């Protein structure tokens, strides 16, 4: 029976020769992930199960990243709860401040996700690891609890949409523009409980950072997961970051897809998602005159070293607009250190931007950049729902690091070509 890439991974982890869409299966897990918001709830449910230990001390990862460094007493209590649980259960992959980072940048960096894995995380953007040719998806805290106790999870096998990427990207266009373009095409429910499977010669043109960004936002189209084929770039990344063995799965040529969508990368311009939904996209030349108050460059979507290099290229030798608060979040300590070694932090600081420790921060309206009533932000984050970054009457425009950096300089949503 012909299967998609996702179906092959799920079949293997279910101990089955084949699976078909709609089938309910029990799957063995390679990693169970949680953060400082979702894990306390999972701990409560885990304790109800009555298990004295997690299924595997090295296959559970907990990353306090949303409200860390602790923003208030309540968040400090949550992190204390998580910290004590990790110590009590001898969880090896607990990442304290100083080692932590934004979880979906940190997990691949630490080699905890490799090709062919099945990963669940109590965070919707767990789908990021599909960039490595893994099946990864977000779940609720109760599913995380069950996963920690049993090492297994139930899934309904998803159907798939095939995205064939062709051509090469134009200057200043990145993975963020690709996924915003796709979400603008199909809508936020356009891939509902489907696997978004990316293929085509254009995949080879994309950096791993681009692939992480695209897979990260598959959930914004309603997808169960997003996944890329494994190529030389993938293998190089995995070998650089992990000593684990891995398995490469390929979709069968005659696998069934709900539909196939062709994407010409050369025709995608810098793209911006307007409030208050990621599907509300416009190309940069359709934006018009929109003044802004804040720029956020970072998050699990666009806080990697490649993203910071692009932002620095735009900001080098320039000053951010005096009316724009510009906040930059390296996604992990390692990325922060690399940015320092490359002189990127100096460029940011000299431009008038501020550089934060790794944290999700303002992305979810947590801290470190909350918007007031009537304020607008350009952000490299993944969601722009009403009140997402602060006041319900604030606005968030989603864009790439290049567009965000250019907008910081001009004080309005701008193409990098206007600045560089």
From Swiss-Prot:
Fetch the HAMAP family from UniProt.
Answer: LeuC_type2
Question: Which InterPro entries has this protein been placed in?
Answer: Acnase/IPM_dHydase_lsu_aba_1/3 (IPR015931), Acoase/IPM_deHydtase_lsu_aba (IPR001030), Aconitase_4Fe-4S_BS (IPR018136), Aconitase_4Fe-4S_dom (IPR036008), HAcnase/IPMdehydase_lsu_prok (IPR011826), Homoacnase/IPMdehydase_lsu (IPR006251), IPM_dehydratase_rel_enz (IPR050067), IPMI_cat (IPR033941)
Enzyme Commission no: 4.2.1.33
| Iron found in the keyword field | yes
Instruction: Name the enzyme group at the top EC level.
Output: lyase
A Pfam family: Aconitase
State the name under which the record lists this protein: 3-isopropylmalate dehydratase large subunit
Q: Which cofactors are reported in the record for this sequence?
A: [4Fe-4S] cluster
* One Gene Ontology molecular-function label: metal ion binding
- To which pathway does this protein belong? Amino-acid biosynthesis; L-leucine biosynthesis; L-leucine from 3-methyl-2-oxobutanoate: step 2/4
The organism's lineage? Bacteria, Bacillati, Bacillota, Clostridia, Eubacteriales
Q: How does it assemble?
A: Heterodimer of LeuC and LeuD.
Give the cofactor note text: Binds 1 [4Fe-4S] cluster per subunit.
Q: What are the record keywords, sorted?
A: 4Fe-4S, Amino-acid biosynthesis, Branched-chain amino acid biosynthesis, Iron, Iron-sulfur, Leucine biosynthesis, Lyase, Metal-binding
Similarity-based family: Belongs to the aconitase/IPM isomerase family. LeuC type 2 subfamily.
């Amino acid at each position: 029976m012909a299967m998609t890439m996702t179906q092959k991974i799920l079949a293997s982890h279910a101990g089955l020769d084949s699976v078909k869409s709609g089938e309910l299966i029990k799957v063995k897990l390679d990693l169970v992930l949680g953060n400082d918001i979702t894990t306390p709830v999972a701990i409560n449910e885990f304790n109800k199960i009555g298990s004295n230990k997690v299924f595997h001390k090295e296959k559970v990862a907990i990353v306090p990243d949303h409200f860390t460094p602790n923003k208030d007493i309540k968040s400090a209590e949550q992190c204390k709860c998580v910290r004590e649980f990790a110590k009590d259960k001898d969880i090896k992959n607990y990442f304290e401040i100083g080692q932590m980072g934004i979880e979906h940048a940190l997990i691949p960096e630490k080699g905890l996700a490799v090709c062919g894995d099945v990963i669940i995380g109590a965070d919707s953007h767990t789908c990021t690891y599909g960039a490595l040719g893994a099946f990864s998806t977000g779940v609720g805290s109760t599913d995380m609890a069950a996963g920690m106790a049993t090492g297994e999870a139930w899934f309904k096998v998803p159907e798939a949409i095939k995205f064939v990427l062709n051509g090469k990207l134009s200057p200043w266009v990145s993975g963020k523009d690709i996924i915003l373009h796709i979400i603008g095409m199909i809508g936020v429910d356009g891939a509902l409980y489907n696997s978004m499977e990316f293929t085509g010669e254009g995949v080879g043109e994309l950096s791993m950072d681009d692939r992480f960004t695209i897979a990260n936002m598959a959930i914004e189209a309603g997808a169960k997961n997003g996944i890329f084929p494994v190529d030389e770039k993938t293998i190089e990344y995995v070998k650089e970051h992990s000593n684990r063995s891995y398995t490469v799965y390929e979709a069968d040529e005659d696998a069934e897809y709900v539909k196939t969508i062709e994407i010409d990368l050369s025709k995608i311009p810098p793209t911006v998602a307007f409030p208050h939904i990621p599907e509300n996209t416009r190309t940069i030349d359709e934006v018009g005159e929109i003044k802004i108050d804040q720029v956020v460059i970072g998050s699990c979507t666009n806080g990697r070293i490649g993203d910071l290099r692009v932002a620095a290229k735009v900001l080098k030798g320039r000053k951010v607009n005096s009316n724009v608060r510009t906040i930059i979040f390296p996604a992990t300590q390692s990325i922060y250190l690399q940015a320092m070694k490359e002189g990127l932090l100096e460029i940011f600081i000299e431009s008038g931007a501020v550089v934060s420790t790794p944290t999700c921060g303002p992305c979810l309206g947590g801290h470190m950049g909350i918007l007031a009533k009537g304020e607008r932000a350009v952000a490299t984050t993944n969601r722009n729902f009403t009140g997402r970054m602060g006041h319900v009457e604030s606005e968030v425009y989603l864009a790439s690091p290049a567009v965000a950096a250019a907008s910081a300089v001009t004080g309005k949503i701008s193409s990098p070509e206007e600045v560089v």
